[in-house]
Design a protein with these regions (language model features):
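Active-site rim/loop-helix segments in enzyme catalytic domains that contact anionic ligands
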Residues: 14-130, 157-165
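Metal-dependent de-N-acetylase/amidase catalytic core
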Residues: 5, 15-27, 117-267
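Sec-dependent N-terminal signal peptides
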Residues: 3-11
Length: 267
């Protein structure tokens, strides 16, 4: 009888035998520029979930063609856009996630449209095609206030709060805890202005705290070095320290609607 039962199991499709069937998620991180996944400290989280078998995508809104740096010697425009596209591919490959989804919009242009229609249409198309279960993006702070970052945040949020995505889709915003950021600035750990000018978030709002492994962090730092056009050696080292500053914990702020309907502001 037992042998007959085992024989029947072998005839079932493989998916029926997989105890993880249906448990794998589509996770999508959406940022403005190639390298944003590193400075937001999200890349080790992406590496973790890819390692665990989830489908992980990185969506990049702009070509990053204006992000010139003297050490790289690459002029603004198509030359730099091509370099940064290759850097994004290198980073995704190093993290073990899917190839990057490049929306190809102009660097510095996202907030110039009166209705933000170009990025709205492109992201709406991406969401309908890939149907992510989990979305991670910039918080309202935009890190250090970059308008491209903030426009990505508002557009993703606009599309999410419409309620037209899957009912189980979740949205999270990357954030740097104020306590950790304060230690960074008071101890003068950083020389790159963006980290000293960062807009931190109180930990009481960062209620999602994901532990990552040492291997995930190492992958994230290796992936950072793919973005060679953006960081000279000393800035690579500083950004690596920034990525390690949260002690293997990645902090996220969830998008949360009120748990119940209320008809009074003061009660």
């Amino acid at each position: 009888m037992n042998l007959f039962f085992i024989f029947l199991l072998l005839l079932l499709p493989a998916s029926r035998l997989d105890k993880h069937d249906g448990s794998k998620k589509v996770i999508m991180a959406i940022f403005a520029h190639p390298d944003d996944e590193a400075v937001t400290n999200v890349s080790s989280l992406l590496a973790r979930y890819a390692r665990e078998g989830h489908k992980v995508y990185l969506v990049i809104a702009t070509k990053g063609e204006l992000g010139t740096n003297l050490h790289a010697g690459v002029p603004a425009g198509d030359s730099l856009a091509n370099v940064r596209a290759r850097e994004a591919s290198c980073a995704c490959n190093t993290l073990g996630i899917e190839p990057p989804i490049l929306l190809g919009l102009g660097d510095g242009s996202l907030s110039k449209s009166f209705t933000q229609e170009p990025i709205h249409l492109k992201l709406d198309s991406v969401f309908k095609k890939y149907r992510p279960n989990i979305i991670i993006t910039w918080g309202p702070d935009g890190g250090y206030g970059h308008m491209d970052h903030r426009t990505v945040h508002t557009t993703v949020t606009d599309l999410y709060q419409s309620g037209e995505m899957g009912k189980d889709t979740k949205l999270f915003y990357a954030g740097m805890p104020t306590r950790i950021w304060r230690q960074w600035t008071e101890q003068k750990k950083g020389r790159i202005w963006i980290y000293n000018k960062w807009n931190p978030v109180a930990e009481k709002y960062l209620t999602i705290r994901i532990k990552v492994s040492a291997d995930d962090v190492n992958k994230a730092i290796t992936a950072l070095y793919c973005h060679w056009s953006q960081f000279p050696k000393e800035e690579m080292e500083e950004t690596s320290r920034w990525m390690k500053s949260t002690n293997d914990t990645i902090y996220l702020r969830p998008f949360l609607a009120a748990p119940k309907i209320s008809y009074d502001l003061v009660r």
